[in-house]
A protein has these predicted regions:
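An aromatic- and histidine-rich active-site surface loop
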Residues: 30-34, 86-104
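Conserved nucleotide-sugar phosphate-binding/catalytic loop shared by glycosyltransferases and other
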Residues: 12-71, 301-305
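A short, well-ordered alpha-helix in the C-terminal region of glycosyltransferases
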Residues: 323, 330-344
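C-terminal alpha-helical cap of glycosyltransferases
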Residues: 323, 343-365
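Alpha-helical membrane-targeting segments
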Residues: 48, 53-82, 95-103, 119-127
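Donor-nucleotide binding loops and adjacent catalytic segments primarily
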Residues: 16-17, 35-37, 163-168, 172-255, ...
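A donor-sugar binding/catalytic signature common to diverse glycosyltransferases
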Residues: 87-89, 246-286
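Active-site-proximal region of nucleotide-activated glycan assembly enzymes
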Residues: 15, 42-43, 102-164, 169
Length: 365
């Protein structure tokens, strides 16, 4: 959900520049409201939402009742707010909202951040007025007649972040390259465990910024760091979460180890960074990672095989990280290939498409 708030926040800036009034619609009891307040300051309204599917017949009936209620609430909300157009990213709240919008003839756009759409986006793409996607390979999964490629909107500061100032933010030096490890706002425990195991070996050749997430991993990672020699401890910069300085972490880095979420596919090119990606299984991250790998901007390591069976350092995670940290020329070539994939005008493309959609519908913008 944070990803949706941030990506729509970038688009919101472009829409607000066009003097458009914005409203974020989320679900009751969800985490959206707090994130919206913190990340974008957009006004927020909630409606009832539930999964289109259910784990069993009882759950399916219950969800159907909740969705019907959500559609009624969405109709009332649309009549009250009179939106010129609606943009969604595929969460549960989008289905009742898009159904109500279609009934009331309000144009809608569904936006696909990842390469491969999930069930929700596939369903919504059929009823949406227009579909937008981040990357060209997604076109094979979506209705071509109404799908456009916009890129993925990211913070504009990523394109111009200053390396020297960014390193100063974290107290980093130029004596060794900087590895940035992160697994999203909630972290990635398997990556964190692998980094814990490899910590002394990596710190001998690099400085590390490690954003471990808010799931309690900081405690045992901090304990592992405290057992290191003092000179290696000074090279390790551990945070559960970065609020306000994530851009500087990208700016300070020479190499990234991360999952392969949609935001990563856009942030790495924006920051001109190569990466070793460890896709999370079962959520289409493999296809996301393959996109950067195919363009020579990243290397993919399987989540289940990061470490060696005998010696952890014999595994592909350490071997690939070590190779890229040591081989400056290869790292810089990958960085250039990564930068070539950037779409700095993605937020403007989505905003323009949404405004055009509203104008063609005859609705007042």
């Amino acid at each position: 959900m944070q990803r949706a708030v941030v990506e729509l926040g970038a688009t919101a800036d472009a829409l607000e520049a066009a003097d458009v009034r914005l409203l974020y619609v989320g679900s009751f009891g969800g985490m959206e409201q707090g994130l919206v307040a913190r990340e974008s300051n957009l006004p927020f309204q909630a409606i009832t939402a539930a999964a289109v599917r259910g784990r069993n017949p009882f759950q399916l009936v219950k969800n159907s009742v909740l969705i019907a209620r959500g559609i009624r609430e969405a109709r009332a909300l649309i009549r009250r707010e009179r939106p010129a157009a609606i943009l969604g990213t595929g969460g549960y709240v989008c289905f009742p909202l898009f159904v109500a919008a279609r009934q009331l003839r309000v144009p809608t756009m569904i936006y696909l951040p990842d390469i491969v759409p999930g069930l929700a986006v596939k369903v919504l793409a059929r009823i949406a007025t227009q579909v937008a996607c981040s990357f060209e390979p997604s076109l094979s999964y979506l209705p071509r007649g109404k799908t456009i490629v916009t890129g993925y909107p990211v913070r504009s500061e990523l394109f111009t972040v200053d390396r020297v100032a960014s390193r100063a933010t974290f107290g980093l030096t130029d004596e060794a390259p900087v590895l940035f490890v992160y697994g999203g706002s909630r972290g990635a425990r398997r990556i964190n465990r692998a980094i814990e195991t490899l910590l002394p070996d990596v710190l001998r050749i690099a400085q590390i910024i490690h954003v471990c997430g808010r799931e309690g991993d900081e405690t045992w990672l901090r304990a592992a760091a405290d057992r290191l020699p003092v000179e290696l401890q000074a090279r390790y910069h551990l945070f559960p979460y970065l609020h306000g300085t994530m851009t500087q972490a990208f700016g300070a880095a020479d190499l990234v180890v991360a999952r392969a979420g949609a935001s990563t596919l856009a942030e790495l090119p924006a920051a001109k960074l190569p990466a070793v990606l460890v896709p999370l299984a079962g959520v289409h991250q493999d296809e996301n990672a393959d996109y950067l790998v195919a363009h020579g901007a990243a290397i993919k390591v399987a989540d289940h095989a990061m470490l060696g069976s005998d010696e952890p350092t014999d595994g592909p995670l350490f071997q690939e990280v070590r190779r890229l940290l040591i081989d400056t020329r290869m790292r810089e070539e990958m960085a250039q290939r990564s930068a070539a994939l950037a779409k700095p005008d993605a937020d403007g493309r989505i905003a323009d498409a949404l405004l055009d959609l509203a104008a063609r519908s005859g609705a007042p913008v």
